[in-house]
Amino acid sequence: MVDFEELLSKTQEVEKKKIDEELKKAFTEANLIVDEAYNEILSEYSKRIQEIISKNIEALRGEEAKLEVETKRAVNKEKDYWVQQVFQKTLDELEKIANTKDYKNRIESILSRELTEGAIVYCSNNDKKFIEGILTTKRINNVSVEVDNSIKGGVKIYYPDKKLTRDFTLKTILNQIFEDLRDDVARILFGE
């Protein structure tokens, strides 16, 4: 027969094995629970992080678009400034054109073609005597000549009976030409 101590020892071993197996099962289950909880938390926070990243990306894209528009506005404003400077410089040079023989011939041609009795010719102070000379030479009577300090060259002809003004000033002609050539001027200035 087996003595008591041996029986006790065997019983302890069997119980120890059972306890070890149950501990292993419990440890495995605990690991599964921890892994599931970890994965759940990881998934939840990953979603939140993705949402935050998406919102930030959208906000950045909005800011980028806004900055692009502001940059284009600033660039266009600067380009317009420089194109306007070219226009102004050209406008300042108009007085030199008014001293050429071609200019004088064209003014004479305009006056011969456009003047009617009772008309008023507006011109620069520099052109007044020249225009009065044309009127005398061409024997165009009953036309008055008045100085308009805003005119640098060319003439405006006012027909009081028709309440009509025809503008042949160099500034008006330059405006028309410049609008047609504005894109070309910008291309030359900015290489576009």
From Swiss-Prot:
Keywords linked to the UniProt accession: ATP synthesis, Cell membrane, Hydrogen ion transport, Ion transport, Membrane, Transport
Compartments it resides in: Cell membrane
Membrane topology: Peripheral membrane protein
GO term, biological process aspect, one: proton motive force-driven plasma membrane ATP synthesis
Any Pfam family: vATP-synt_E
SUPFAM superfamilies recorded: V-type ATPase subunit E-like
The organism's place on the tree of life at top rank: Archaea
GO cellular component: plasma membrane; proton-transporting two-sector ATPase complex, catalytic domain
GO molecular function, one term: proton-transporting ATP synthase activity, rotational mechanism
Family: Belongs to the V-ATPase E subunit family.
Oligomeric and partner information: Has multiple subunits with at least A(3), B(3), C, D, E, F, H, I and proteolipid K(x).
Function: Component of the A-type ATP synthase that produces ATP from ADP in the presence of a proton gradient across the membrane.
Protein name, UniProt field: A-type ATP synthase subunit E
